[in-house]
Design a protein with these regions (language model features):
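Hydrophobic alpha-helical transmembrane segments
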Residues: 1-174, 178, 186-317
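Glycine-rich phosphate/dinucleotide-binding loop and adjoining beta-alpha-beta core of small-molecule
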Residues: 183
Length: 317
């Protein structure tokens, strides 16, 4: 029933997203990471070796704990009733996907940009990006929103979809645990330089194949949505390594090529300037409507991934 649970979860996310009133596993994961970090920092030596060990313990405990706990719940529910087991898996599969939430948040940015309210647009984009937004121009806000749609299409949709097709909701939520660790601990500053290193490497490994699949699917999605598949393919091949992370530029490069715009480049994080290479060619100025176009491609590649995954699962399993 895993295929049915994945399909149902995809539909649930598409229709409802993540309602604010509904408890989300990622919130619990975040609290667990913070609690573990606090305890480990208090007990381990404040040395590079001690911090590496602490990060390694978090990187082991959280994914393993997530898989065991969710697996036991799914197993227990299925023993009570196969339909209850399916419902639990379907619900968690929906929570592991983030397409609807990503589209909603990025389109909030689009709405404020179209209204011409730059301060409101900066505030809206600050909810979905990690960079400093208080001094961004309208073009900078638009770029940030498009980039986050492209990047999160991989780790917010394609990667969890791939893992749930392989191992159901428990494996998808285990991936979300790894991704949440990376979001909270992977900072190149004094506090997390060593503590966040092992969680970051684990996230790189977990995203290696999904991100490349997402980049290829984005090229196909560009053709389906009336954007430039040729440009997506060309820039993906050229610029997919233009990022400190081995995975982040996979979908960003395909998106930039599909739209004919330039993404990435230098940015400020916590008041510090970070020089970063650009992605894509500025064949035209970026515009707010590119946020909508990016979301259309994100949904198209998500549907392609779902159909392809279900077809392969049906043949193999």
């Amino acid at each position: 029933m895993t295929g049915l649970a994945v399909l149902g979860g995809f539909v649930l996310d598409t229709l409802f997203g993540d309602p604010a009133w509904l408890p989300h596993p990622v919130v619990l994961m975040g609290k667990a990471i913070s609690a573990l970090e606090k305890r480990l920092r208090a007990r381990l030596p404040k040395t590079p070796q001690g911090e590496l060990l602490g990060g390694g313990i978090v990187a082991f405990c959280l994914p393993v704990g997530t898989f065991v706990c969710t697996g036991l719940v799914c197993l227990g529910a299925a023993r009570l009733s196969p339909w209850l087991g399916l419902a639990v898996q379907m619900f968690w599969c929906g929570q592991a996907l983030a397409a609807k939430g990503l589209a909603q948040e990025s389109m909030n940015v689009h709405k404020e940009l179209v209204k011409g309210d730059l301060p409101a647009a900066r505030k809206a984009v600050s909810r979905i990006v990690g960079r400093d937004t208080q001094d961004l121009t309208a073009e900078g806000v638009t770029k940030a929103a498009v980039e986050t749609v492209a990047e999160n299409a991989s780790d917010g949709v394609i990667a969890p979809l791939l893992y749930m097709l392989i191992g159901g909701a428990p494996l998808a939520l285990t991936y979300k645990a790894i991704n949440t660790m990376d979001s909270m601990l992977d900072y190149k500053n004094e506090k997390y330089l060593y503590f966040g290193r092992i969680p970051a490497k684990l996230d790189d490994a977990a995203n290696y194949l999904p991100s490349r699949l997402a980049g290829l699917l984005w090229c196909a999605a560009a053709a389906l949505t009336g954007n430039s598949a040729k440009g997506a393919w060309r820039i993906w091949r050229r610029d997919r390594r233009n990022h400190a992370s081995p995975n982040s530029a996979q979908t960003e490069s395909a998106c930039a090529g599909a739209l004919g715009v330039q993404l990435a480049g230098p940015a400020y994080y916590f008041g510090e300037y970070y020089p970063k290479p650009t992605i894509g060619d500025a064949l035209r100025p970026i515009e707010p409507e590119d946020i909508r176009r990016a979301n259309k491609m994100m949904y198209a590649e998500s549907l392609l991934a779902l159909l392809l995954g279900l077809a392969i699962r049906g043949v193999i399993l």
